[in-house]
Swiss-Prot record:
It comes from Borreliella burgdorferi (strain ATCC 35210 / DSM 4680 / CIP 102532 / B31) (Borrelia burgdorferi). Heterodimer of SbcC and SbcD. Signal peptide: none annotated. The keyword Phosphoprotein does not apply. The lineage of its organism: Bacteria, Pseudomonadati, Spirochaetota, Spirochaetia, Spirochaetales. This is Nuclease SbcCD subunit D. One of its GO terms (biological process) is DNA metabolic process. Keywords: Exonuclease, Hydrolase, Nuclease. Pfam families: Metallophos. SUPFAM superfamilies: Metallo-dependent phosphatases. SbcCD cleaves DNA hairpin structures. These structures can inhibit DNA replication and are intermediates in certain DNA recombination reactions. The complex acts as a 3'->5' double strand exonuclease that can open hairpins. It also has a 5' single-strand endonuclease activity. One of its GO terms (molecular function) is endonuclease activity. Belongs to the SbcD family.
Amino acid sequence: MSNYKILHTSDWHIGKKIENFSILKEQKNFLYFLLEFIKKENIDLLLVAGDVYDSKRPGFEEQRLVNNFFYELSFTSCKWCVVISGNHDKKDYLSINKKLLSRFNFFLITEYDSDEQIVLLKDNGNLKFIVVCLPHINERLILGQNFDNIFGLEDQYSSKLFLENLENAYREKISNLSNFLENKYKGIPKILMAHSFFGSSKKIDTLGGSYIIPFNVFGNGFSYVALGHIHKFMKLRDNIVYSGSPMQYSFNETCDKYINVLHFNDNKLILQEAFPVPIFNKLIFAKGSLNEVLDFLANSKKEESFTIYLKIELNEAVDTSAEESIYDLARLNFMNLVSISYSLPSSQDLQDDSNFIGELEVLEMDEKYFFEKKLRWDFENGVIRDIKFKEEELISLFNEVLANGYLGEYEDK
């Protein structure tokens, strides 16, 4: 009887910043947790479904952190590790790991169409798992150059034709792979990894310029589908799962994060367990009046187990001394204050009579126009107070900086 444990994770985004705050320390804590979890649970296979890095050009510290993790992984119970690239990854940087870990069963797949995209995992010479890898690819490249002049036209038939062909291309590729593997390796568990948007609709759809592929393109030929790209833990079907990101990376994300552990027994998936990831950072958005925000900060508990990043939106204008009070209270509670913004009831006064600045106006007006318009509104509504410069002096100073800036005199300042 053979038992194996598989851990599915994705979207680490190592090197990610919360505004200007580095969270590399928190990400290091996550990777330490993950390594210890793998040791404790005796994980046999680690699947990382894309976006290891946040930038296509990660810095030295980010690369060292990732490389050290995979190096340490090679000394654990983990027999294999399979990683695919996401839309944030660049294969050149990920490939460093591949060279470092050649002695370890480390498989890195960065090409959508490649002989390496079918990974055969063996234990003592016996084939145990097959992992099919579909790293992220710009969907428009899937169909080649034939649709370059079709996509983007306003003609409804052209865009509909593109979407139908894109869905069919996904479906055909996955179906061909599934049928080939089933005929050649019958009875061996097959896992598919992909990094893209998939949804529960029956037909392909678009949202904000992104394509949402129906998950039914996966068919029924895989024991498990390990997905990356969406930061929320989500099951499209019981065996089609987004593991989500391990940490909160935006203020509209929940801080509930998971890693998914699969239990295989005699080539069958018998159990899935979603283990919560400890909170290493928390992003909080606080909105209200000055007094409400100050009360919130005064009553907040100091957290030592994780780092807090705070965004504040005030519904009333305050002076700089009030903003300083907010910053001071945040610091006392070990909170990183990302920004203070305003959502004022009279903000429509900033807009022109048509209620919105028209497209023509945006094209015709320059930086001076928008600076003067915003500055005048700030003076009239009390956002700017207690400064030694008059409105006219600030405008004159801005014009000077703008002129010198164009000449490059402020480039190093």
